[in-house]
From Swiss-Prot:
Keywords: Cytoplasm, DNA replication inhibitor, DNA-binding. Its main location: cytoplasm. Belongs to the SeqA family. Homodimer. Polymerizes to form helical filaments. It is found in: Cytoplasm. The gene is seqA. One of its GO terms (molecular function) is DNA binding. Signal peptide: none annotated. This is Negative modulator of initiation of replication. Negative regulator of replication initiation, which contributes to regulation of DNA replication and ensures that replication initiation occurs exactly once per chromosome per cell cycle. Binds to pairs of hemimethylated GATC sequences in the oriC region, thus preventing assembly of replication proteins and re-initiation at newly replicated origins. Repression is relieved when the region becomes fully methylated. One of its GO terms (biological process) is regulation of DNA-templated transcription. It comes from Aeromonas hydrophila subsp. hydrophila (strain ATCC 7966 / DSM 30187 / BCRC 13018 / CCUG 14551 / JCM 1027 / KCTC 2358 / NCIMB 9240 / NCTC 8049). InterPro entries: Arc_rbn_hlx_hlx, Ribbon_hlx_hlx, SeqA, SeqA_DNA-bd_C, SeqA_DNA-bd_C_sf, SeqA_N. It holds the Pfam family SeqA.
């Protein structure tokens, strides 16, 4: 596997073309370029590689937890929104892929608030700050914690960090 450096706009375009959780960048590009999965790529000269875009350190999330900002916030909905916004900033592609999670009867995340309203009359969709996503908000704190835990698990965060974040909501 090779790593390439992309401009942000191209990176976000590729991420927006994700169809399901776990779809790799290679799968997305093959689909967009209409290339079969087993076709061998031509051998080219190696290029300078950039660091792959991964959750790895989750610097923004750690900074949010360490700053005490979440503890200062009185309302769980505001803490929930801060966490979601930070997760998106840390890893937009992983967040986009992970937003495919759904409840038994409801869609939790969407780029379209009407899609959330269609999954239930009392979902109260709100925009996630600094992201193109909307999230249902008419849920209890436990459900919000569960949504964040599912989202973070899909994004590749470890159990310890997930527990720490959910405990702060």
């Amino acid at each position: 596997m090779k790593t390439i450096e992309l401009d942000d706009d191209l990176y976000f375009y590729i991420a927006s073309q994700t169809r399901h959780i776990g779809e790799s960048a290679s799968d997305i590009l093959r689909r967009l370029l209409e290339q079969p999965a087993n076709q061998a790529a031509p051998v080219t000269e190696p290029v300078t590689t950039a660091q792959p875009h991964t959750v790895a350190d989750a610097m923004g999330l750690e900074a949010l937890l360490d700053s005490g900002e979440l503890q200062k916030e009185e309302k769980s909905i505001n803490r929930f929104m801060q966490v979601l916004s930070t997760l998106y900033r840390d890893d937009p592609v992983g967040f986009t892929q992970a937003t495919e999670i759904k409840g038994r009867k409801r869609v939790y995340f969407s780029r379209d608030p009407d899609a959330l309203r269609a999954s239930g009359s009392t979902t109260k969709p709100k925009p996630v700050p600094e992201t193109p996503f909307w999230v249902i908000t008419n849920t209890n704190t436990s459900r919000k914690q569960n949504m964040v835990a599912q989202l973070m698990t899909s994004m590749g965060y470890g159990d310890e960090v997930i527990a720490r974040v959910c405990g702060a909501i």
